[in-house]
Amino acid sequence: MSTIITKRQFPHYHKYTMDLAGRPLTLEVGKLAELANAAVMVGYGDTRVLCCVTAAPRPRDGIDFFPLSVDFEEKMYAVGRIPGSFNRREGRPGEKGILTSRVIDRPIRPLFPYDFRNDVSVMCTVMAVDHDCSPEIAALIGTSAALAISDIPWNGPVAALKVGLVDGKLVFNPDAEQRKVSDLDVTVVSTGKKVVMIEAGANEVPNDVMFEAIKQAHEENQKQIALINQMVQEIGKPKFEYPHADFNYELFNKITADFMDEAKAAMDTDDKNVREQRWNAMIEKWHEKYLEEYPNMDQYLEEITYKFQKMIVKKWLLEGHRVDGRQKNEIRPLDAEVGVLPRVHGSGLFTRGQTQVLSVCTLDTLSANQKLDTIWEETEKRYMHHYNFPGYSVGEAKPARSPGRREIGHGALAERALLPVIPPVEEFPYAIRVVSEVVSSNGSTSQGSICGSTLALMDAGVPIKAPVAGISCGLIQDDDGSFTTFIDIQGVEDFHGEMDFKVAGTKKGITAIQMDLKNDGLTMEIIKNALDITYDARCQILDQVMLPCIAEPRAEVSKYAPKMVTMHIDPDKIRDVIGKGGSVIQKIVAESGAKIDIDDDGTIHIASPDAESCEKAKKCIDDIVFVPEVGQLYYGRVVRLMTFGAFVELAPGKDGLVHISKLPDKRIEKVEDACKIGDMMWVKVTEIDEKGRVNLSHKDAMKEIAAKEAAGEPIK
């Protein structure tokens, strides 16, 4: 009996296409990952990303948050490479993968129902990469489409676009070559009406240019929205019903009625610890008064606290009152200090209210650059910023752990903010690492890290183009659509507010933006308002606090930092400097005590704890690559005597012949009558033959020296 094989059919396969920034965008459904709630294969140019969304059928018990996980998987086969790990498998997500996961998470999370407690997984797998077509944008679009057509409750869709600035013109989804020269890299995610996410790095771009880029991206995003809405109409599934999170509104109403005045008094302080102590004392009173009537009240207390505090904070902010008594455009008390730690290369302490960040800068040779093995074009990083957030910074007793996604995201934001002002390697040939230790946190620690990094870099003598400061802007909206924005949000305002709009930059313009939302998006009016007030605030921070602390980078690097010398040689001479099996360069390193890095273009960076070792290594390399020039004078040592002349060493391993007739002015019978081994003499290069042999003349050299002395010219 023969085996029966039937060709597999895909009756639910659909393909949707559109043009996106001059390149084809395709969304394919119904062929891959059929068991997921929804799956979309996104094609953008030659980039391919499979986006799958899955939801648990029942809510998770005992939680008061939405359990959403977003993973952006970078497969090395997508760029035709085998992973460099020991077992040649992809390991944990890299920094860029984590940051991309966060970029996807932030715009989609606020659009899920507030009381949805089912686990939801978003998995974006990069399967092929065309560097002209961003996998990040493809993953955002695919995630939006998959959630929109799935049966998972979600209030999308969203659309995403990158905008660059090339030669003063805005460019949608710039290709690889355009990105290299672009002064702007902003990702804008929109719904049909509002902007829900902004992530930007920029080369000191003015507010009006940034606003125009966001505005145009939002308008362009509507084309994607229309395509995804078409998919929903044609193949979308009905959203499933879910059990709404339980909440005791009766108890909540009693507590707010009985304890409103006491709650306001508890909230009205600029001290985070005092606020928490007052609130905890008030919760004990709730227990005494209501526990008998509501024996299970503990399961609602966290949600009651959140809603109660938000009610107060929202009302106050709309009235122009803040929990610590500040005005909406008032920044908390600031302080800046440099040179905080001994022996480190540079340090800065930035304090804003109860938020304190200690940033420390370390300089090293270029061999310390971070090597990157990813699907992205960048292969190494010279400037690195790392952010640490220990438990004690918020008064929590918890052990130290490796950095999580939040720490990596905050560190990357501060890194992006300072990168445009970091000097080029030709001007400052050091690898640079800044570590920001959050020692106390009451909101805006990422912006504190930006200010602290600037202080540490300047204290370390890094010649940054301009100082950078960061500030955050919050938002509260009323039910009628009216809103108020406020500057420098602290922890409780961040927790209960609707927006954390972080902007970093110099006086000239913006270097980084990150926007987090808890609502359904921002109008253009709110975005413009946020850009305007953050500009004024960061200029005040620079002028009134940071620049009075340290007006410009120190003239020299720390005495504890490695000394650096940069030189350039003919690339053809690199093999001579390295030697067979590295023998020559290893000898130079051993004799001089210096570190040596050689680039393919012939640039050599020499580093050592002291300048003497650098100069010693430089002289060794100069001697190796030395090439005599016809007509030049050299002062060399006699190393060999022959019957026909003397060999003079011009540099180690490089000598030339002075014929007996070119030694003295008078006729001599023997070479020994004019010189002996070890004598030093001036010689002039008269010829270099086709075999590279160098002919010298002592006689011509002395005549030229005499003429220069008579004319008062220096002898080189």
Locations of regions flagged by a protein language model:
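Flexible, glycine/charged-enriched surface loops at secondary-structure junctions
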Residues: 114-120, 155-157, 224-242, 273-274, ...
